Amino acid sequence: MKNIVLNETPVRTSKNYGINNIEIKDFEEPVIKEFKNIKITDNENCISSEKENINLKFGLGEYFLNQSNEQSNVDLKINVDKKLKEPIIIEYNLDKSNNVLIDNININAKDNTKANIIVIYKSADEINGYHNGICNAEIGANANIHVTIVNLLNTKINNFYSVNSNIEDESKSLFSMVEFGGKYNVVNYYAKLAGYKSVNKLHSIYLGKEEQRIDLNYITELYGEKTNVDIEVNGALKDKAKKNFKGTIDFKTGSKKAKGKENEYCTLLSDTSYSKALPMLLCTEDDVEGEHSTATGKVDDNELFYIMTRGISEKEAKKMIVKAKFNSVIQGIKEEEIQNLILEEVDRRLD
């Protein structure tokens, strides 16, 4: 076992805030073996099992990148060369025999393409486990790509995840992130808006319970003119769960008339849960627009009382409030079966 520091912010702030990175003490390296529990829905034959080493500008850290490149037990490449009519769905299920997953997903979306890609991580309730994953997306000009990553792992498995994307001229990308699982749930997201009028939306929800530790580090860099970034994050914490949110929008030289905004809101469902946030706007270009906000609060007593006057218990009323805050992200996923799966998990985890 060893101590490990990961998920560094692109610009450091005072150590007193305790948010520049996250330290995991007594980190235990996994024993990696074959992973067999994977289900793929790919009606248009876009997926192949192909190993490609990935380079990350940020990511979680050298240890996790090297592990993914050298020791992965699932490697998938998704080639999108047309406008797909049906979604691609990849589902990993961790169980007692498949409790260590090191997966790489490489998405290559060519110019003028369209795709809806959904990746789901699930697990049995009782197992300990380990997940280190990377999703890398190269999005060509005038493409329209929606990537959904759904983390429904239990609260005993350590979850480490990196998302990396490069977005070209006039392409539209939406990343929907559902972050519910993981004893440690540490996520690094990076998007490079390289092309003129490229758009990147990141819509994320998180839910923490028990003693979960959530560390979200979302970084976007705008290079192209008239690029647009929209980061919307909503979460809830109960029991002794703790969350760090770090959101960075960086306007690079040349990104004239670019726009970027980020908003994060955390609902505290207990007096022992804890939330920290660090929103950052960085800029080396004059003619841009940027805005950010973060807020943390408890459930509004008046709203809670109003719902309970309708004969609804306090627990069910809080579930309704949380699901209402999550609704826009869940509805944006489009696949009704996945929506219902997420809503059921909200109910189960808030019981």
Question: Predicted segments — roles?
Answer:
Residues 1-73:
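Long, low-complexity, mixed-charge
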Residues 2-31, 91, 126, 150, ...:
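A generic "cationic amphipathic patch" detector
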Residues 59-305, 309-312, 333-351:
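Conserved beta-strand/loop scaffold segments within soluble protein domains that form the structured core
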